[in-house]
Design a protein with these regions (language model features):
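Solvent-exposed interaction patches of small proteins and small membrane subunits
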Residues: 2-146
Length: 146
């Protein structure tokens, strides 16, 4: 006969496996791969349209990252986590992400991309994507995969 702890472990394993088939999570994985491809293309050709493509793919990744994390937290029983900041703060509290300040900076950068009119800001965000944000996305995927 199964005890309570064994049933809980089986239940959590099912929730995690079910989450891995979640469309947000699947699309987040794909979007991060596309972001890496765009960064490689920029490194290879160095043209500004490639940089713009990196920034656009970053926008997709950011949306899918917080929505995937939200779905994971909902599957864990959380409610009232409807904004990107709230989701990522809860993810930090649950040790899903390690650096909440970096994620808040990432979300701020994402908001700036909606109003990008100057080359300097675009360049700064591009460098952050390449040097920091891509790593955050990859770490999140690894953590959510369990």
């Amino acid at each position: 006969m199964l005890n309570h702890l064994t049933l809980r472990r089986l239940s959590m394993a099912y929730i995690i496996e079910d989450f891995k088939t979640n469309s947000y999570f699947i699309n987040f994985n794909k979007a991060v791969c596309r972001l890496e491809e765009a960064l490689e293309e920029y490194d290879k050709y160095g043209i500004s349209s490639s940089r713009d493509g990196v920034i656009q793919r970053f926008e997709f990744c950011t949306e899918l990252a917080w929505k995937s994390t939200r779905e994971f937290l909902l599957s864990e029983g959380y409610v009232d986590i409807n904004s990107p900041k709230t989701v990522m703060k809860q993810a930090y509290a649950d040790n899903i992400i390690e650096d909440d300040e970096a994620w808040l900076e990432l979300l701020y950068s994402r908001n700036l991309t909606s109003h990008l009119y100057d080359d300097s800001t675009a360049s700064d965000i591009f460098n952050s994507i390449k040097n920091k944000y891509l790593g955050l996305f990859k770490a999140l995927i690894a953590k959510l995969k369990g």
